[in-house]
Design a protein with these regions (language model features):
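Long, solvent-exposed N-terminal ectodomains/accessory regions
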Residues: 1-60
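ATP-binding glycine-rich loop module of kinase domains
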Residues: 34-128
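Conserved structural core of kinase catalytic domains
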Residues: 91, 96-115, 124-127, 135-181
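Activation segment signature within eukaryotic-like protein kinase domains
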Residues: 186-187
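Conserved hydrophobic alpha-helix
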Residues: 190-197
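Catalytic-loop of the protein kinase fold
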Residues: 197-215
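C-lobe/activation-segment region of protein kinase-like
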Residues: 215-278
Length: 278
């Protein structure tokens, strides 16, 4: 299957991959998702590229067409339809497809669409039980009866970007950061949001500084892709490295509270050490 000559304009996702060896990790190629003639494709490239516009189409291999059913679930009348004209302070969350090559070979080739549907149901519940420290959901963006994205309120910045614009690892940041601005109210906001989720029988399961937005001094919890009901399995549920206990395999309230404590230590409050191993 040939690729378009102006591939750079149609590349949706690119990600370098690495494989482990006795001598450490080594570069194994670049994964790419691109659009051609209205269809989406997943491919692998042999080289590194600084920009999608530099992609050498002759390097494309393992090309797979991604069926719509793999990433866009069917819209149901029970769901909220997003406004046709979205507010300026909003954005559309669309599914990431960079791992589709692996997913397509598994037992759940439509798991991306299933995960989108799961997150929609979580947001619909949260919409009925709104809270100032939980992201505002505006509804589903729909095309031809399929959910193409989730429309959400947009917030200025993450807690991670505010505290750690240099993307230092959390231990190095903790050891070098001088505590200045008071973030106790932010921690209280995060806890209020967590407690609200727990009152609904939900656990976020991925509380970390990149999933906390800051808006006029208020903390808002975002990204409910890993959110599960209390007691549910966390098998195949994505969580953020360094911010969760890898031994925990089920959705427990303590998962969120432990992550909140990790953020508190990360912000420099107290002398405790980090719980989660790098």
């Amino acid at each position: 299957m040939s690729a378009p000559p102006n591939l750079g304009q149609d590349v949706l996702e690119m990600n370098e991959t690495y494989e482990d060896s006795d001598n450490g990790f080594y570069f194994a190629g670049t994964l790419m998702v691109y659009r051609m003639n209205g269809n989406l494709y997943h491919a692998k490239l042999k080289a590194r590229y600084s920009s999608p516009s530099n992609v050498n189409t002759n390097d494309l291999e393992n090309i797979i067409q991604i069926p719509i059913s793999a990433y866009n679930p069917t819209f149901s009348a029970e769901f909220t339809l997003a406004p046709e004209t979205l507010p300026t302070n909003s954005f559309v969350k669309t599914p990431r497809l960079i791992s589709y090559d692996r997913i397509s070979q598994g037992l759940r080739p439509n798991s991306i669409a299933e995960d989108v549907l799961h997150e929609v149901r979580i947001y619909e519940l949260l919409r009925r039980h709104a809270h100032p420290n939980i992201a505002t959901y505006l509804g589903c963006q729909v095309s031809n009866g399929m959910i193409t994205g989730l429309c959400l309120q947009k917030y200025p910045r993450t807690l991670l970007k505010e505290i750690n614009p240099g993307s230092l690892n959390k231990r190095h940041l903790r050891n070098t950061r001088v505590v200045g601005k008071d973030y106790t109210s932010i921690l209280a906001d995060i806890e209020r949001g967590i407690r609200h989720l727990h009152s609904l029988g939900l656990v976020h399961n991925d509380i970390n500084p990149n999933n906390i937005m800051i808006d006029n001094g208020r903390a808002i919890i975002i990204d409910f892709g890993s959110c599960r009901k209390l007691g549910e399995s966390l098998e195949d549920v994505g969580r953020t490295y360094e911010w969760y206990d890898e031994k925990v395999k089920h959705s427990f309230f303590e998962n969120d509270l432990a992550a909140l404590e990790e953020i508190r230590v990360w912000l420099g409050y107290g002398e405790e050490t980090f719980q989660f191993v790098e």
